[in-house]
Amino acid sequence: MNIDLQRRYDSSDDFFSLGGSVVMKLSADAAIAVCERAGQHGLVVARIEGGIWHFPGFEARLDCIWDGIDPPVDVGVAEQNNLAAAEFVRSESQEHDVFVVTAPEITGW
């Protein structure tokens, strides 16, 4: 199954099973779950880009970008970073309803 670029995904499972980093558009709840579960998959959230969903389509917003840490990092540092990423999505979810998560492996790009 390929990632549908014209769809907003509501499940973090889809992100991990399809390799959604950088391209998958996620609902706020799914993006929060991705951030919270990323460490379990050996990933660190390096960037989140938020926007507004127009069915279909993603309007990226320059006022909704969060930059995390770049790998390589250890697991503890990644977990702290990923929790901060989840908090960012929570704080932006009233104004923005779709998010793109960039999450490389903690060992490096």
Curated annotation (Swiss-Prot):
The lineage of its organism: Bacteria, Pseudomonadati, Pseudomonadota, Betaproteobacteria, Burkholderiales. It holds the Pfam family ImmE5. InterPro entries: Colicin-E5_imm, ImmE5_sf. It comes from the Bacteria. Signal peptide: none annotated. It comes from Burkholderia pseudomallei. Specifically interacts with cognate toxin CdiA, which inhibits the toxin. This is Immunity protein CdiI. GO terms for biological process: bacteriocin immunity. Coiled coil: none annotated. SUPFAM superfamilies: ImmE5-like. Immunity protein component of a toxin-immunity protein module, which functions as a cellular contact-dependent growth inhibition (CDI) system. CDI modules allow bacteria to communicate with and inhibit the growth of closely related neighboring bacteria in a contact-dependent fashion. Neutralizes the toxic activity of cognate toxin CdiA (C-terminal 282 residue CT fragment) upon expression in E.coli. Does not inhibit toxic activity of CdiA from other strains of B.pseudomallei.
